[in-house]
Amino acid sequence: MARFDVYRNSAIEGFLLDVQADLLSHLNTRVVVPLLPSDGGFQPARGLNPVFEIEGGRFVMATQFLATVPSSLLKAPVARLGASRTEITTALDMLFQGF
């Protein structure tokens, strides 16, 4: 499990993006952000909701729906978004700092 790995979301359509620092990998939970289908009616807010392409589809990072899940729910990653670190961190900063 690594920060910015993407996992299938068994609860709803879309994925979960792991945003927790790898330093805390000993915990039995992970902080995640849902990645929702861009055609699902969710209107992205600039800076808060970047859009990523995963498995040929476009998915919105629903930063305001940040949650914690048991690590055991996250199986094999289907994608890695480490190359989008700046966009992801900017969205988290927008949520917590307002900029």
How does the language model describe each region?
Residues 52:
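N-terminal glycine-rich FAD/FM-binding segment characteristic of electron-transfer flavoproteins
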Residues 3-6, 15-48:
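Compact nucleic-acid interaction/catalytic patches
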Residues 56-99:
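C-terminal terminal-subdomain/extension
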